[in-house]
UniProtKB/Swiss-Prot annotation:
UniProt subcellular location: Membrane
Disulfide bonding pattern of the chain: C151-C165
Domain of life: Eukaryota
Protein name, per record: Proton-gated ion channel subunit pbo-6
Residue stretches spanning the membrane: 234-254, 268-288, 294-314, 379-399
Gene3D superfamilies: Neurotransmitter-gated ion-channel ligand-binding domain, Neurotransmitter-gated ion-channel transmembrane domain
GO cellular component term of the entry, any: synapse
Extracellular side: 21-233
Pfam families cross-referenced by the UniProt entry: Neur_chan_LBD, Neur_chan_memb
GO molecular function: excitatory extracellular ligand-gated monoatomic ion channel activity; extracellular ligand-gated monoatomic ion channel activity; transmembrane signaling receptor activity; transmitter-gated monoatomic ion channel activity involved in regulation of postsynaptic membrane potential
GO terms classed as biological process: chemical synaptic transmission; monoatomic ion transmembrane transport; regulation of membrane potential
Subunit structure: The functional channel is a hetero-oligomer of pbo-5 and pbo-6.
């Protein structure tokens, strides 16, 4: 019994000592390393000499583009890397620890900001995410953020427009003698989530230098090119406008009674014009108010409004032609009018079949009525063709611009490229 008790006591003692040594080796060394780094590091002082900062971003999602206020909102992952000698240590003195994590507020961080930002949301402020530090002094600061940046919107080809927005990163206080900003590669797209309205066309970056108060400042500019997906606007605006226009044209030039009652046709034309004017206001509220460029969609809608206006005015001309037969009982339509409207050929065949003169069969009122009916048919056909041509062209442009395929190819190529950096 005494031997068994002694064996158990020795076993428990050995395990306790081993656990204590393990805890001291890993947990104690980590705490000791943190105290060591914070004691010799001054968070208010940047590293000695010029600091080379590698600045890279990963585009995650284009939240939206506000055309009226001319800005773009994006979600990005930002990774900044630099070397700080005061945060280095010898691995053998801390039981082989090569990496550690320090609180963000406890070390020096470069003041890299977005110069053209309107709003900046740090998504990890409440989380207090730590910063990774390597034994060589290399610091890696990674965080997600939502930026709302200024973006000059071009509206001349709306809704077939492409936009190029910039995100400009630079140091606020330090010049190039102290901070040299570099980017090792284009923005990554490994985790990109497509936008419903905008198709991503290209992403690129460039490093530039500019002078500010007699100092040279380096900046990194990221270019994000997007193209609008126009199909929604064609379905919601172009198609209703076209249908209203065609129906109004058909109503304006439909066959009417011999009592020449056409006054309600003007009401139809005015109603159609007002309906399309309301639809054009929807587009006007969507795009910036600019006097330099008029959106293509606004030009189209104003064009069909003008066409309906002209058609409404021409209705009065047809009314006068129809009424002329009741006012002039012996004055027949001129031959050139009958030839233009193909009436002469019709009644020439009629003469050959029946052997009677045209004037002996038809009264003058019927002749002018036939002229007005032919004018209705001709004008309705001409206006519908004129209005249909730009409408078909808009749909042709829409189907020619396969933005979804271009975006898919871009993302596939970008993901293959991004594998080199992971």
């Amino acid at each position: 019994m005494q031997c068994s008790f002694l064996t158990i006591f020795i076993f428990i003692t050995t395990v306790t000592v081993g656990v204590a040594e393990f805890s001291e080796q890993y947990q104690g060394s980590s705490s000791r390393l943190t105290r060591h780094l914070l004691e010799k590091h001054n968070k208010c002082s940047p590293p000695d000499g010029r600091v080379d900062i590698s600045h890279n971003i990963e585009l995650v999602h284009i939240i939206g583009i506000n055309e009226l206020n001319q800005n773009m909102q994006v979600l990005v992952y930002i990774v900044q890397q630099w070397t700080d000698a005061s945060l280095s240590w010898k691995v053998e003195e801390f039981r082989g620890i090569k990496h550690t994590w320090l609180p963000e507020h406890s070390i020096w961080i470069p003041d890299i900001i977005v110069f053209n930002t309107l709003e900046h949301k740090m998504l990890l402020e409440a989380v207090r995410s730590p910063i990774k530090v390597s034994y060589t002094g290399e610091v890696t600061y990674a965080y997600p953020a939502i930026y709302t940046v200024l973006c000059q919107i071009g509206i001349a080809t709306f809704p077939f427009d492409d936009q190029v927005c910039k995100i400009r990163f630079a140091s606020w206080a330090y010049d190039e003698d102290k901070i040299l900003l570099n980017a090792s590669h284009k923005p990554l797209l490994k985790n990109y989530s497509p936008n419903e309205e905008w198709a991503l066309q290209d992403v690129d970056m460039a490093r530039k230098e500019y002078e500010h108060e007699e100092t040279v400042v380096s900046e990194i500019i990221y270019y994000i090119k997007v193209a609008r997906k126009p199909f929604y606007y064609l379905i919601s605006l172009v198609v209703p406008s076209y249908i209203i226009c065609v129906l109004s044209i058909a109503g304006l030039f439909a066959r009417f009674s011999t009592k020449h009652e056409r006054q309600e046709r003007f009401t139809l034309g005015v109603t159609a014009i007002l309906s399309m004017a309301v639809l054009s206001l929807v587009v006007t509220e969507k795009v910036p108010h600019s006097s330099e460029n008029v959106p293509l969609l606004i030009v189209y809608m104003h064009f069909i409004i003008v066409m309906v206006t002209i058609a409404t005015i021409l209705t009065s001309t047809v009314m006068r032609v129809h009424a002329k037969g009741f006012r002039t009982h012996f004055l027949s339509p001129p031959n050139w009018i009958r030839k233009v409207l193909l009436i002469a050929r019709k009644h020439a065949n009629f003469f050959q079949q029946h052997g009677k003169v045209y004037m002996d069969i038809h009264t003058t009122a019927e002749q002018w009525g036939e002229v007005s009916r032919r004018m209705d048919y001709l004008l309705a056909s001409v206006f519908i063709i004129i209005i249909s041509t730009p409408t078909l062209y808009l749909f042709y442009m829409c189907f020619q611009m396969d933005h979804a395929t271009a975006e898919r190819v871009l993302l596939e190529n970008a993901k293959r490229r991004d594998q080199l950096y992971y």
